[in-house]
Structures are given as C-alpha cells and as structure tokens.
Regions:
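Two-component/phosphorelay signaling modules centered on CheY-like receiver
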Residues: 14-33
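Acidic catalytic/metal-coordinating carboxylates
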Residues: 37-40, 63-66
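Active-site beta3 strand of CheY-like receiver
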Residues: 48-54
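Short, conserved "switch-loop" micro-motifs in signal-transduction and mechanochemical regulators
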Residues: 86-87
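C-terminal output helix
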Residues: 90, 108-117
C-alpha cells in the first residue's frame, strides 16, 4: 500500500490554509503542518521534513520567494509548489528560477491543485 505524501501548507490567510487542507485530505495527502509566516515555515520545514511544501508567494514580512530560498538552502532537493494570485507572474518566474517545482493560481480549482502536487512529487 502506498503511503500518503506529507505536505506542509504555508499561507498567511487561515482561510486559504483551510481550503488547501480540505482539498489535500480529500485526495489522500497527509497535511503534517501549517505555517502562517515565513519564519514559521522555515522552522516547520526543518522540524517536519515534509515531502512537499505549498507556499504562498505574498506574505507579510518574509515573502514566499525568500522562504523558498531559505528552505532550499536547508534541503536543495526540497519540493515546493508556489501559490499565487493573478498578476504575480514576475514573482512566480523568480520562484521557478530559484527551484520551485510548479505553481497553482488562486482561486484554487481542486483538481488542478491535486494534479500539480502529484506532478511535483514525481
């Protein structure tokens, strides 16, 4: 039997974290943790060692691209999928250039989220 992939959700908006958690748990992923800011995200990544991180691009304080860089300093093989609102193409490109596997646009379409994460985990 295949084990569930372990996911860390990072978003400053509790509602967005709840939406992603709901999509993932309904599709056989295990949400091992959540973080509401960049410092918490880096600490939880190091503590939990998830298979993949969903990471909001725009957060107060440390933005998602900076968090991505810090996570990849700790683990160059880390799998990270960025979450972005429309109009953030420049930041998405920067994130991909810094090692993000893919991105998902807000508002989320559940099937697109699942497909993107499964592809990033291959």
């Amino acid at each position: 039997m295949r084990t569930k992939k372990r996911i860390l959700i990072v978003d400053d908006a509790a509602f967005m974290r709840m939406m992603i958690r709901d999509i993932l748990t309904k599709n056989n992923f295990e949400v091992v943790g959540e973080a509401a800011n960049g410092d918490e995200a880096v600490a939880k990544f190091n503590e939990l060692k998830p298979d993949l991180v969903t990471l909001d691009i725009t957060m107060p304080g440390m933005d998602g691209v900076t968090v991505l860089k810090k996570i990849r300093e700790q683990d160059p093989a880390a799998r990270v999928v960025m979450c972005s609102a429309m109009g953030q193409q420049a930041m998405v490109v920067e994130a991909i250039q810094n090692g993000a596997r893919d991105f998902i646009n807000k508002p989320f379409h559940p099937q697109k989220v699942v497909e993107t994460l499964r592809r990033a985990l291959q």
